[in-house]
């Protein structure tokens, strides 16, 4: 297939990005005294946050809801792990240099815990907390940092996990949420800075063996895939990747939400997304009231991420409980206010509508009219499976620009998720799989639905059985506590954030081990 001019321009830009990153890390000689460039380590050596012996992981996991599920999978730690807080230089969406931070987790000990080790680059999921620091494994809300240290670093992987621009020590007032270009640069720069920090003074025997694995969950699944795409385009080595439960088919996902399939974190998601794309492209709205209802329009551009807890923002009225009005924009959209199928997710969709809502009916109507005029090929019906050909709505244009149905991997990929996910719908995984089957048949892609039946000679039988048992335990606990819906609501509440991650991350670890 011939490359379009657009693809060639992207390829050239990415190559220049990587080259600039390498140049600024000392791979080229020169006497410039300019400020540190992309990928530069801003604090050398990086600060040590904590060191954890193998036995300590059992205690930490036992006090964590995700960790408790991991322990049920016969988990054991092998290596001591030293966690460093890294600070590095990256760029904002406009290409301006900006500082960011993250974690570097270094294993040590005997055997595979020392010497040349594989690198695991991890992209975390959606965070509303501006102070989020994945290097602080003891912080409330940092399940991902703990799980990455336990599943990968304590098993001999060097783990690099950026916080992203907009969090922790970052000076940017917003987060470039689901901005494929900026977020992939952030990941690449965190990786470059971490590699320059190795070997560390604390663990001098652990080095990078040249093998790179990329994974991420939820928002991080999207970021992981965008990063893989960017690195592949630049000719950088990626050994294997495992994007997990991510919104890869972003244009289809956006259409699904506006057409009544409102996911369970839609208010938070759209608040972050609007700030991201308005800052990146400048054309999402002229005034925030073009999209958002009063009284939310005035503060929405800088509301998230916040140092105020998301629950407080919801309880004090800074954010509404619903995304859309329960009154449809017109009678033509009554069947989508809310959507009723698939039936198991109908209660989630219904919760996205109410008398107090974020998005005006006028804006929802204009979005839906554009979706009808230029439909996505993957939603509501699967036609060609491609993003919309010519959207005129600015949000739909931005979603198409960041949609990942545009490339094919040359390194092995595992896609993992659960078919009843109420947060990131599983059709994202299916559309990505189908796109690659049609457009990149040489790609080596494995797809795992942890919520599916065990098949004959199923290599993931134990994970599927474990997931079913974990889901049944949530149901039972809910019923014992008085639930009258057979525990359905409890399962949906835990599905994306608690039930799926330990199983998909365990699958990713096994997948990567085969290429290590």
Task: Give the positions of each predicted feature.
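C-terminal catalytic histidine-bearing segment of alpha/beta-hydrolase fold enzymes
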Residues: 255, 391, 395-398, 420, ...
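Catalytic-loop region of hydrolases
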Residues: 23-115
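Alpha/beta-hydrolase active-site loop
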Residues: 177-200
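Short, surface-exposed "cap/lid" segments of acyl-processing enzymes
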Residues: 92-101, 105-156
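Accessory cap/linker subdomain of secreted extracellular hydrolases
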Residues: 247-406
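Primarily recognizes the serine-hydrolase "nucleophile elbow" in alpha/beta-hydrolase
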Residues: 192-265
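Short beta-strand/loop motif that positions the catalytic acidic residue
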Residues: 409, 414-421
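Short alpha-helix in the alpha/beta-hydrolase fold that links the catalytic acid
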Residues: 227, 411-412, 425-438
